[in-house]
């Protein structure tokens, strides 16, 4: 298989043609109808292979089966080119969890170590082939664990993280993650999910971080991205949470692990379309 990268943007559109099951056809990455919704999670390209991961939910929030989606006649277009939809299946590829932990000293030590315990719950529940890439963010952005599926190494690295002075620089974090993804694209698991974990106290003193809560980080790094905000006053952030459409998760430190596992269960409901990219589009930025 030729190892090329194809740059994609919102020109990649998933259309559902048999509308009896899904209501009105939807364009761009998110579609809603009275009968249900679909949301594109990520596109993975390893030319000529192109995989599209997405969610198709009914009106009650339950996932449609691959058979129903296939029967609906999905169409995939890249710009003005229609791509062949070979099959629709439950997504089974491993996931690379890209986790950024706020290790600032201004977080209460008890909260910080509870946060680390929550991450351990996520590691416990990860599949054997899933990967973890771990960043710390206080003072400077550092990748303390390159992507690995070695759980012993995950636990060891997590246990070595200490609190330091400084605050999170979200612009630097996003830049570092994007750069790392591009340099190790083929070595990482096909599916990727970014998660930022921080404390409400940090947000109230860091306007750049506050702005990040109101933005869609996934648009900047090309994958699903979620921010976990530990707080015992969720009402302060309810407006932001509503606007974030599931990207912002409010929780107490004690329930962080449960929330991370919930997200993992949600990721397990994704569907996948496999297709191929025409050779004429190899290497193009669209």
Show which residues each predicted segment covers.
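Bacterial N-terminal signal peptides that target proteins for export
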Residues: 1-10
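C-terminal "exit" segments of structured domains
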Residues: 48, 251-286
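Von Willebrand factor
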Residues: 90-147, 152-198, 227-228, ...
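VWA/integrin I-like adhesion module and closely mimicked acidic/polar interface patches used
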Residues: 198-266
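Bacterial N-terminal signal peptides
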Residues: 10-20
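Acidic, polar low-complexity linker/tail segments
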Residues: 26, 34-98, 105-112
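Sec-dependent signal peptide cleavage junction
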Residues: 20-31
